[in-house]
């Protein structure tokens, strides 16, 4: 059964409730364990996933800006795990990178995470131990940090986009983790696309209702190309960080793995029809989320939204920036003949036999060893990322946000994950305001597992 057939089998899905929300309690836990969920239509049976508290995606964690997030993570899996709080400017020891900022949480053990959420916005949490497998099996969820004052919207909807590689004969997740093709090409791409764990998610709305849509790409490697239909929208934040002015959605927009986009949309579709967040895939389009218009809103159309309140930031000083170069090499059709690994030069054949296909600056990446850069606290650094591979890469920096620089070298979007197209060179700039050893890696998670990672040390 191909993806089209699998999607068609679910086309009659009914409207479903929102993902579960966990209001922050005094001593809450987060338990990683196997679970069975109805991921596919019922005729296919249930799918075994690895999940937090038995659901995938995991419960939404929601706090106010400046509040603490406390979770005791209990590992009831048969393998080690950890939890990374993606996009949070966090204390290094709470970052959740197994083998770098903490030991992995062994089976039967637990670990207490306790940190402040300094920035309002849309974030997420996910496993950071063999993440190319554990995230794909379902170990992730939304982390929402609310602004001090409510935003002028009628509803706030969190939409976790994902894809799953499913064997339709068994309804189980394909166990082909670490497959050579995934490691060396575009990554592990699923054949079943969901929102909040459901295909063809539908929600009831009123015409002229104003919604805040928080889109999170939790997939291993899929780049979502999206559009709006029957909705008038404005992008108000990237990766949790507000834009200085809302940007009207004129055409399509892209959401790479690990990225988030906050939209404010007005429902313009007629009563009895539906507005859609549309996924464009090659020459086809699908409804990612449908907003079924059941009646008129009690409110009239409003003017364009105001910008969200900004999060605190020290702007990069580009006149005194330290320049760091990062050249990405390797992969299928990349032409790389070899790279340094473990302190010695290895041929491409030897690299492939060890499951490594990619290199940064001629070295197979790792969390230990020499960092890509050592930067003083408060120093501005400008990272020049050159993609000499045949594939795009979503590059994520832990512990801090950065500005993408435009072609004129001016500060652009403030993000934690940037998409670098094949053959593209992109510059980003950040203020190293958070001390620690911070991972920099491709969030096509199979790529990170096969060489695409480095470290930036802030001292």
Task: Enumerate the language-model features and the residues they cover.
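A long-range scaffold signal marking pre-active-site subdomains of enzyme folds
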Residues: 22-88
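Extracytoplasmic beta-sandwich strand-turn segments characteristic of Greek-key/jelly-roll folds
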Residues: 56, 61-63, 87-119, 199-201, ...
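Short, hydrophobic/aromatic beta-strand segments
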Residues: 81-86, 222-228, 394-397
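Histidine- and aromatic-rich segments of cupredoxin/plastocyanin-like copper-binding domains
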Residues: 94-95, 103-107, 176-320, 408-416
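Hydrophobic or amphipathic alpha-helical targeting/insertion segments
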Residues: 117-146
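Asparagine-centered strand-capping/turn motif at beta-strand->loop junctions
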Residues: 73-77, 216-217, 385-389
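Extended terminal and domain-junction accessory segments
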Residues: 17, 22-33, 135-167, 243-382, ...
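N-terminal export signals
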Residues: 5-23
